[in-house]
Amino acid sequence: MNKRVIFHVGPPKTGSSAIQQFLHQHRQQLLASGVLYPAHSVDENGISSGNAREICVPDPEGRLVLDHQKLTNVLSAFENNPNSHTLLLSSESFFRIIDDITQAVPDAEIICFLRNPVEFQLSIYNQSVKRHGNQEPFAPGKRLNLGQWESILNTANQLEAHQLHCFAYKNHGEKGNVITDVLGVLGLRDELSVSGNSVNVSYSFAALELKRWLNQFPIDALQAELDAYLQAASAGAGRYRLLDD
């Protein structure tokens, strides 16, 4: 295949929701520049699972695994599409099956992001309070989780240098942007403008503590409305730390 096939694989907690929302909203502009990004659903908060279902199916335990027939169909349709020279697929689900993907598509390019493991741990805690009813105060783990770093290093050792596009994750407000990093790989950094809006906003400290306290009550029916309100209330709030220096 003389065309480019690119998989954005996340991993989790590295801005995938913002990337996928932007790509989904700009599908027509991308296609006009020769980049095919298949459509997918996006919820009211701009959150999506991306293109996972395009090439994956659930196994008996409900985990998404690569479906080689689906992948073949997608690649064949792309190869026969005269209007596109690049296929871009995005999903955090791809990170777990990255070895299967690179074996099935040896020339594939991979886009991924690395996040400070301390920030990753804090983000996981924030999410546990937001979405999973955690009522406990933050307690740092005894060891940092370096699993993502190790997986990416293993992938790097299996690919040619030009096949792996690995970037540092940028927090909102820091110089640079995960979306512009992706556009740079596509050669479209100057073609599309990127707003400073956030997707799946982290709670401010006050919102986080309020939600943690509320989690002791039966609030399942209010979760979506409450989450939308707390995200809106947290927009523009300053950064905070749950760890002492």
Question: Which residues fall in each region the model found?
Answer:
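Anion-recognition interface
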Residues: M1-D245
